[in-house]
Amino acid sequence: MKVRPSVKVICEKCKIIRRKGRVMVICQNPKHKQRQG
């Protein structure tokens, strides 16, 4: 899980979702997991 000020889609399998007011990227590739904050 990378924590970044701006989350970006890295590949076509990445999805941007909102959980509890946080913007997150979920993906099949665990290296692409990101969270904003």
UniProtKB/Swiss-Prot annotation:
GO terms for molecular function: structural constituent of ribosome. GO terms for biological process: translation. One of its GO terms (cellular component) is cytoplasm. The keyword Ribosomal protein applies. Pfam families: Ribosomal_L36. Signal peptide: none annotated. It comes from the Bacteria. Keywords: Ribonucleoprotein, Ribosomal protein. HAMAP family: Ribosomal_bL36. Belongs to the bacterial ribosomal protein bL36 family. NCBIfam families: rpmJ_bact (TIGR01022). This is Large ribosomal subunit protein bL36. It comes from Acetivibrio thermocellus (strain ATCC 27405 / DSM 1237 / JCM 9322 / NBRC 103400 / NCIMB 10682 / NRRL B-4536 / VPI 7372) (Clostridium thermocellum).
